[in-house]
Design a protein with these regions (language model features):
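N-terminal Rossmann-like NAD(P)+-binding domain of SDR-like oxidoreductases, especially those catalyzing
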Residues: 6-218, 336, 346, 353-364, ...
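C-terminal substrate-binding subdomain of Rossmann-fold SDR/epimerase-dehydratase oxidoreductases
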Residues: 14, 18-20, 24, 33, ...
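A short, amphipathic alpha-helix embedded in the catalytic core of nucleotide-handling enzymes
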Residues: 57, 202, 231-236, 263-267
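Residues in well-ordered alpha-helical elements
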Residues: 101, 113, 125, 132, ...
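Hydrophobic alpha-helix immediately C-terminal to the catalytic Tyr-X-X-X-Lys motif of short-chain
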Residues: 194, 198, 202, 232, ...
Length: 389
């Protein structure tokens, strides 16, 4: 059975054969941290956030080799990486993190010392109808990667999680800090909480140098338009209304992707092993407020734009808001610099220019009020490994 095959392929050498020496530890809590990578593997690097991280690292640090591993799912695109495709310090490998043989091969042959793990299924709506695929990719995929990384003695492993693991926040509650209890409320968030729990266990059990990040809602160029901001922009360009879940009062903190790429740059070089870092901002807006701002941006001649707002049934469960404290990351020298208005303007401009074929499978299904993965998208446990890397 496929599941049995997946479990067999995920097995790696016994712990006794691991190259990682737990006696050699990087700075711990309260210590100065300064880290210089050599060869970086970015998983999910053709996706939204990770593609911006790849571009930043490739361009800013020509002395680093950046290897991007991505299976090119429906929401990823090699076009996201066009601007670095010909850089000598960049390499792309098509492959799936569920294949331990492939991961071990890449880590060995590319002499990887640093991993930024962003590969994941991330769309909450999809997790309500196909949660098993989220467990496969987000939990098992992370576990496969951690075991392979441990076996080669990885020097830094950054695990990308989400603020959704904290669960819903309410107006009278303080902001969530990194040590707070995790209370995920949807299958996507639950798999991300499980994945980061496994990642952190490798720090506690083996002193493997793991860092976890939890970010706010990110927006900007390259994002597949199943997510709220690009979906609304694409619909408005087509003269279709923004589809508001419920009454539109649910709020989110929206942070521009360029600021998030800068945060990962900071964490890569200055983060402390074993720590968790929230990546957040102060730009909180309800979904209805976002829709109205986008109506004005796309159709400035229709100031009210009520005909471009449509209310649809809410998700099975929709968190009221997420509110996180990023003080720990600020102490490393990072703060967001792009305002919501500036970020929205850049985002609208990009989506107006780019056609739907930026993504191989198109975007029609993504523009539905409650999108599901496009027909024909495979959720098989282990996909084919390319014969040539």
């Amino acid at each position: 059975p496929a599941c049995a095959v997946a479990i067999r392929t995920a097995m790696v050498a016994p712990a006794a054969a691991d190259k990682y020496n737990p006696a050699v530890r990087r700075p711990t809590k309260g210590q100065e941290a300064s880290y210089t990578p050599t060869n970086i593997l970015v998983t999910g690097g053709a996706g939204f956030i990770a593609s911006h991280v790849v571009i930043r690292l490739v361009k800013s640090y020509p002395q680093y080799k950046v290897v991007c591993l991505d299976k090119i799912d429906y929401c990823s695109s090699l076009h996201n990486l066009d601007e670095v495709a010909n850089y000598p310090n960049y390499k792309f490998i098509k492959g799936n993190i569920l294949s331990a043989d492939l991961i071990k091969y890449v880590l060995d042959t590319e002499k990887i010392d640093t991993i930024l793990h962003a590969a994941a299924q991330t769309h909450v709506d999809n997790s309500f109808g196909n949660s098993f695929a989220f467990t496969e990719n987000n939990v098992l995929g992370t576990h496969v990667l951690l075991e392979s990384a441990k076996s080669i003695g990885i020097r830094r492993f950054i695990h990308v999680s989400t603020d959704e693991v904290y669960g819903s926040s309410y107006q009278d509650e303080p902001s969530r800090r990194e040590g707070d209890v995790l209370e995920p409320t949807n299958p996507y968030a639950a798999t991300k909480a499980a994945a980061e729990a496994i990642a952190r266990s490798y720090w506690f059990s083996f002193k493997m140098p793991v860092i976890v990040t939890r970010g706010n809602n990110v927006y900007g160029p390259h994002q597949y338009p199943e997510k709220v901001i690009p979906k609304f922009v694409r619909r408005l360009v087509k003269e279709q209304p923004c589809c508001i879940h419920g009454d539109g009062s649910n709020s989110r903190h929206f942070i521009y992707v360029g600021d998030v790429a800068a945060a990962f740059d900071t964490i890569l070089h200055s983060g402390v092993d074993g720590e968790v870092y929230n990546i957040g901002c102060d730009d909180e807006h309800t979904n209805l407020e976002v829709a109205r701002k986008l109506v004005r941006a796309v159709h400035p001649d229709r100031a009210e734009g009520d005909d471009l707002i449509e209310y649809v049934p809410d998700r099975p469960f929709n968190d009221v808001r997420y509110y996180i404290d990023s003080t720990k990351l600020h102490a490393l020298g990072w703060k967001p610099v792009v305002s919501f208005e500036e970020g929205l303007a850049k985002t609208v401009e990009w989506y107006k220019k780019v056609s739907a074929d930026w993504w191989d499978i198109g975007t029609d299904s993504a523009l539905a009020a409650h999108p599901t993965p496009p027909a024909g998208v495979s959720n098989s446990l282990v996909q084919d490994v390319p014969s040539k890397l």
